[in-house]
Amino acid sequence: MDTVFQFTMPTKIVFEDGAAFHAGDQVEGESVLVISDPFLYQSGVARKIGEGLGGRRVAYFSEIEPNPSCESVDAAAHAARDAGAQCVIGLGGGSSLDVAKVVACLVSNPGSIYDYYGGGTKQLEHREAQLICIPTTAGTGSEVTNVGVFTNRNTGKKVPMLSPLFWPDIALVDSTLTHTLPAAVTASTGMDAFCHAIEAYWNRESQPMCDMLAMRAMKLILENIKTAYDHPQDAQARRNMSLASMLAGIAFSQTRTTGIHAVSFPLTVEFGLSHGEACSITLPAFIRISEEKKQKKMRELCGWLGFADVPALAQAVEDLMRSMNMRTRLHEAGVREEDIEQIVQVGLEAAIIQLTPAEMNRQTVTALLRSIL
């Protein structure tokens, strides 16, 4: 094989039911900040994690919103500095985990996220605080990536931020935390994981290691997501979905994502879709055009997943989404014909769109979106 690639994955993974409640076995230092959303704090989950930290000093920041803003990052960083945090634990979906990555850096790097993000001129120099990520959904894979995505309220745009300092030291993947997910969240985060996997697989920067992980992740999701949706206490289905999400996260951490995620940013910011919904609503349409530059590879994937061809795979994915009451047409999310031009414009501004295995320009993206309006 003449393929040349690099693969970097420095995060220690602990994949075990119950591991989250023994996080103290992994923590270094005596002062810990646990970052979560309000629900995980109010329901007692965050405090239960804190109680398993072996008597260390624990502070909590529980104000993380979906699609977190830079202001939330700065507020959490202020809490971490006040606590003298030697360890930052991100607990939750991708929003909390992404915030934890930046906060762990801002403990020892002065200023605001705005100094380092977007138009900021500073570089994150080092990270002294330990970073542990504990996912409570099976979807984002953020526990094994070095990227965070944040909403800049000044511009109204949602933009990724990457740094080698964002790799978590430890990912504690405990599928029992997903047993109480609402059905809609199980569906949207699970299909987000499928997007991660297929975007890594068909990516113009794909590589053999990622292909292997992505293929396994896709098969696990197709075999388990409906069971997890219909029977939320099915431990094996939940475990398989957590595994799939993690594998997909590792895969796209190396390749980045493609057009699905590029177009999702304006759908989230302007139309209020969750990240998983914003990605999955265009998934079948992107599958249908994936043969343009990856015909042989996509046919191999269809064989692995048990489908005759790419159209059959696209239809099966759309049918699966419908069976979980997910939207598959843009008008169902409030998008009108006159909105498409702006969605296309923002999507094309994301560099990752050019990693899609098809020509991505104003005409082709407009046609794709109109096909699912």
UniProtKB/Swiss-Prot annotation:
PROSITE patterns, alphabetized: ADH_IRON_1
Which residue windows are coiled coil? none
List, alphabetically, the Pfam families matched: ADH_Fe_C, Fe-ADH
SUPFAM superfamilies reported in the protein's UniProt record? Dehydroquinate synthase-like
The record ties this protein, via CDD domains, to: Fe-ADH-like
Under catalytic activity, the entry for this protein gives: 2-hydroxyethane-1-sulfonate + NAD(+) = sulfoacetaldehyde + NADH + H(+)
Q: What is its EC number?
A: 1.1.1.433
Q: What is the similarity comment for this entry?
A: Belongs to the iron-containing alcohol dehydrogenase family.
Q: What is this protein called?
A: Sulfoacetaldehyde reductase
Organism of provenance: Clostridium sp. (strain MSTE9)
Q: Tell me the name of the encoding gene.
A: sqwF
